[in-house]
Amino acid sequence: MAKPAKRVAVTGAAGQIAYSLLFRIANGDLLGKDQPVILQLLDLPQAQAAVKGVVMELDDCAFPLLAGVVITDDPKVAFKDADVALLVGARPRSKGMERKDLLSANAEIFTVQGAALNEVASRDVKVLVVGNPANTNAYIAMKSAPDLPKKNFTAMLRLDHNRALSQLAAKSGKPVASIEKLAVWGNHSPTMYPDFRFATAEGESLLKLINDDEWNRNTFIPTVGKRGAAIIEARGLSSAASAANAAIDHVRDWVLGTNGKWVTMGIPSDGSYGIPEDIIYGVPVTCENGEYKRVEGLEIDAFSREKMDATLAELLEERDGVAHLLKN
């Protein structure tokens, strides 16, 4: 017997990331090949015609799992009974825009969306914020949804995780699928800290295999941190397909489990690893039965502490920059 359809809300539905995302969701890549989905698509009033065009294409794919589509400019319609909410739309940084202006423009969007989720979404809704600054946007949405569990709100660090995996595979000559126990700590920004001290490939320590601290500090960490900028430089457009792929990975693993493998998610801190509570911070997790669980008890050396504190300082600055815009 067919499963009842799950409702997946996607914001920024007319944008480039959504264009790479929606067809894969409708194809079963997000929630499984036996799980029908209803897409609930949100974008601005001026983007509604473009969203309709995307939906025409979705129709033309005749996806067996696509049980329905809603198009709206009202967050309360888009998030109604949503099981998953992918918050992709955000205000991009325009030329000459100060970071604080970007923060307040996004605070406005994510307070409204957080409040709408609070009011109408499923109480078990899984929220992934993709739109930048993702960690702080997720924090704003979480703080604007006091009736939903904090653990429902996450930010995407999976793109950074996947970028780090690919760099490590290239350097070590090992298949990307063989690499386990990678962590990416902190903010989805160039301050993030990709950490392969615990990582293995085919059971061997990557630290021993690569054995090049200079490469780690001066090539690997900056390459992962600045990869988004390098793609804009090369392509003239920001990474969209790889971001959509990471969003699929993040939610699929959260829902269907990681079989004990570590992945990175931006989640509300519980105070461990010296991160203040509620800050949405990238940490290694495993997922099982629809829940994520942080990997605990990892040793933090002096270099790692310095890196983790630097990315935390940026997150605290962002949090303080939006504090006056939040009621709670």
UniProtKB/Swiss-Prot annotation:
Swiss-Prot/TrEMBL GO biological process terms: malate metabolic process; tricarboxylic acid cycle
Residues that bind NAD(+): 12-18, 106, 113, 130-132
Domain of life the protein comes from: Bacteria
Pfam (any one): Ldh_1_N
GO molecular function per UniProt: L-malate dehydrogenase (NAD+) activity
Catalytic activity: (S)-malate + NAD(+) = oxaloacetate + NADH + H(+)
EC number assigned by the record: 1.1.1.37
Active site positions: 188
Residues bound to substrate: 93, 99, 132, 163
Keywords for this protein: NAD, Oxidoreductase, Tricarboxylic acid cycle
Alphabetical list of CDD domains matching this protein: MDH_chloroplast-like
Functional description taken from the UniProt entry: Catalyzes the reversible oxidation of malate to oxaloacetate.
Family: Belongs to the LDH/MDH superfamily. MDH type 2 family.
PANTHER family found in the cross-reference section: MALATE DEHYDROGENASE (PTHR23382)
Stated name of the protein: Malate dehydrogenase
Name of the coding gene: mdh
